Amino acid sequence: MTGTGKKIIKETNAAADHVTSEAAAAGKDATRKLARFAAAVRYDDLPKPLVKLMKQCVLDTLGLCIGATTLAPEAKIIASYVKAMGGHAQSSILGFGGKAPAAWAAFINGSLAHMLDYDSTGDGGHTSVATIPVAFAMAEKSGGVSGRDLIAALACGADIHTRLAQSVDIQEWAMVEGWLPTQLLGYVSGAATAGRVLGLDERQMENALGIGFNQMSGSRQMAVGEAAHLRSMQAGFSGQGAVLAAELAERGIIGSKEIIEGRYGFFKTYVRTETPLWDALTGRLGTYYSLLETHAFKVWPACGITRVTTTAASELRERFGVRAQDIEAITVTGSLDATRLLCEPMDRKRRPKTSIDGKYSIPFTTAVMLVKGNVTLRDYTAEGLQDPAVLAMADRVTYRNIPDADAGTEGGRGSAATIGKTTVEVRTRDGKVYSSKPQSVPGDAENPVSDELLEAKFRDCASFAAKNINSGNIERAIEMIWDLENLADAGEITRLLCA
């Protein structure tokens, strides 16, 4: 979110402690406006840069689903459970092969998409994992869903997810109240995505959003201390709930109304605010897509907050020529909530036992970059987690906090909450001190990744598939994704990857 947007949020929340008549009027029919937008959005209405972004997100996300099948130990457990559930073979299980009912396919593919913590980010967490597995599960089940309709569904889902996040002080709220926005908002954004694939009308879409809302969950406790497998699975839960919401609405189930603005709606119950930014939520619907300014791709497979410290470590190597063998001490200075979350307990963060613990550790990930000059998927394998040089470097990492009010962490997404506010300082054995305070990170909108990098990332992830994928199918899938708007049946892509 821009600095202006963050300032507006603070001023607005400080200016009122009750619902004014103006605020009530501004929020009138907010849920219905979102439902109307989701039901009506068409491919031809989308700006070309947004179409390109959606295709990049598809390439990125599908590859990550496949790679997780052998790199994340929980993947096999979930796959065996889903397959044991049986049911109609409707939608593909990426990386493992086979099919499951659409809701279960959305559950496992949504879980797989976030397991490597390599997925793209935006305001509100990880919009792609909350929407793309849902869209493909529904597209395969329905059959004959065009690439253009799929893109429209993804665009509306991602936009609604982003708008919900930008209408509140998302970073501060999520940290203080303890919610994980990806899962929490994913029930509604995913329901909009699934509903658009199904072609729901406005009333059905409103019901779908209401059914999704009533399933909302996602506590940040799953990421405190030793990270639980549930952190990987958050978009699986919301994805399954989203499919359920859309399918029930299609069959006539009536959902809750006014789920955003109502007496017990999203703002009152989850955010506890009387003064959200209504214009950020419903202003210029269908004509303005702020995710074009905020969406970011990861070039390193770890928690978004580590992107800043990893960038700093990279800059120390490249700009100052700092060599691993010369480093005596490393100090990370950053905001209280973000830095503490990824640095405590320090003994566990320096010696992560699992892949997800390593990805959620500033000491370990910073050490990898300082020792190796890059951070890859292999650094979080069982072997990578035991690298003696990396562990020795992690032992030299300490951290200091800046109060959040001073660091300015309000608003923003993942790394955006710490860009320009986090410093990595190294002291060498000869007493010299070097520091880096990144103002941007690779993969952000202002520092975009190339299509070639995303293709290489896709191929690398696909090489870890539990069920081997023919190299020809991998290349054909890449071609189909770039040409998605011309596909008559978008489900061809996932079927090809599971052939």
Question: Over which residues does each language-model region extend?
Answer:
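Function-dense linear segments that define catalytic or interfacial modules
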Residues: K99, A105-I160, L164
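Hydrophobic face of alpha-helices
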Residues: V51, K55, L59, T131, ...
